[in-house]
Amino acid sequence: MNGRSYEVRTFGCQMNVHDSERLCGLLESAGYSPVDPGGEADVVVFNTCAVRENADNRLYGNLGQLVPVKKGHPGMQIAVGGCLAQKDRAAILDRAPWVDVVFGTHNLHRLPVLLERARHNAAAQVEIAEALEVFPSSLPTRRASHHSAWVSISVGCDNTCTFCIVPSLRGRERDRRPGDVLAEVEALVAEGALEITLLGQNVNSYGRSLGDPGAFAKLLAACGRVDGLERVRFTSPHPRDFTDDVIEAMATTSNVCHQLHMPLQSGSDTVLRRMRRSYRRDRFLGIVERVRAAMPDAAITTDIIVGFPGETEADFADTLDVVRAARFSGAFTFQYSPRPGTPAATMDAQVDRATVADRYTRLVALQDEISWAENRALVGRRVEVLVSEGEGRKDGATGRMSGRARDGRLVHFRADEAASSSTGSGPRAGGAAPAVAVAVAPTVRPGDVVETVVTRAAPHHLTADGPLRSHRATRAGDAWALGRDGDGGGAAAAQQPADGRPIVTLGIPSLRPSSPDPVGPASADAASAGADACCTPVRR
């Protein structure tokens, strides 16, 4: 240990969240330790997003708040990485000269060296690589959750959407070999993970660089053969590349969740053409129809941008029509904002802000109405919930706990009544496996699995205020308790050091004590969260 503490602050999408896990692993491998809650870190790292305009504002606002902190904290260092750093480079120092290190998306592994060099030379260090130097999955990683984990299957993107700057910042798509992906999945499950999310900018194009265009469906099926892996999710697919073999794999692989997040972006063929999205509304709705035919209980969510340059009222009406037809369980909705360096930023017919805001309000109102109706249909249904921490912001006040159903819906439930060990006979939602008689543990913990009955619905969540129908303690729950209390047990305990914090390993990463669950999309409006408009925002 070098005696210095660190904090990583993450803006943006799941890619950034997973990269931040790697930054934590790199720093801890270099001897840094996480700052204590409420403490003042010696090193603050910002992992930035460049997709939306307010991403810049959030970064520089946060950097400004650290000026007096740094003046009163001798030796403190500030580093800025991620997509905005890759884009703006040394210009960050022009706006925030108190920053010590700027690094990009292709050289995460250089952070500890750059911090040490900046300290030794007493001068800011800017190092931006033009291409990926080390595949990120080979880096040390400190996972954010004991029970859920991201697993990258590719990095970069070969699409050329006119509103998106990500390909120029993340590079062209590079795929991991299926054997490497499965080795990581198996290692995570051996440590107690119950759920993994396969991660890529466009998971449906996975395998092309390996000479196997059908590799993604095969990978899903292979995940179904991993003993102990209970839930498999993926994000994000692209409608252009979405094929029926993936639908079949989702429907026939028992641990693949019946949840699909598929970005629509617009329901107007004219706007989709200007966006260079390479599909049209009929193809999108055809995929939705085939998914629902194969999996009637599937929860389908999406991303939608309103106010794209040239969007007319008729174009917007087409989007509303698709939303009504698709009946999404939730949508991440965005007001278009031009990003320098993208073709859309210089297009004619930019839509005025008042019109964009009006359309956004109307879209959100329609989607909330649909989400609420879809959720009300689940009242009285039995759901299996993987318990998490940080999902329910009001859990402390309401006395509830929270987690995700198999279809990705957020469920707030009461855990203060004894769970029954009987199997029950009520209907189940989200494709949950039938309950079996279990020994009920006295305390429900993040990482455990419960079954409960939905008693109330809201547009963005379900509530279950009745007694639990079952509760299954898991090794992930044991590990959470160990990290919180310094005790615990089970096989998970054997993989923890004496202080209850999991180790950081190279290549096959380790899990981390409690932190907000990285599970993917559900009904929410994320426009104010500085989120990515082409990959699903993550809740923090």
Curated annotation (Swiss-Prot):
Q: Where do Low complexity bias regions lie?
A: 492-502, 520-533
Span of domain TRAM: 376-468
Q: Which cofactor does it need?
A: [4Fe-4S] cluster
Which residue ranges does the record annotate as region Disordered?
Answer: 480-540
Q: List the Gene Ontology MF annotations in alphabetical order.
A: 4 iron, 4 sulfur cluster binding; metal ion binding; N6-isopentenyladenosine methylthiotransferase activity
- Listed binding positions for [4Fe-4S] cluster 1 are C13, C49, C83
Q: Which Pfam families match?
A: Radical_SAM, UPF0004
InterPro entries named among the record's database cross-references: Elp3/MiaA/NifB-like_rSAM, Methylthiotransferase, Methylthiotransferase_CS, Methylthiotransferase_N, Methylthiotransferase_N_sf, MiaB_methiolase, rSAM, rSAM_horseshoe
Q: Where in the cell is it found?
A: Cytoplasm
Function description:
Catalyzes the methylthiolation of N6-(dimethylallyl)adenosine (i(6)A), leading to the formation of 2-methylthio-N6-(dimethylallyl)adenosine (ms(2)i(6)A) at position 37 in tRNAs that read codons beginning with uridine.
- Name-wise, this protein is tRNA-2-methylthio-N(6)-dimethylallyladenosine synthase
Q: Which organism is it from?
A: Frankia casuarinae (strain DSM 45818 / CECT 9043 / HFP020203 / CcI3)
Which classification does the entry list for the species?
A: Bacteria, Bacillati, Actinomycetota, Actinomycetes, Frankiales
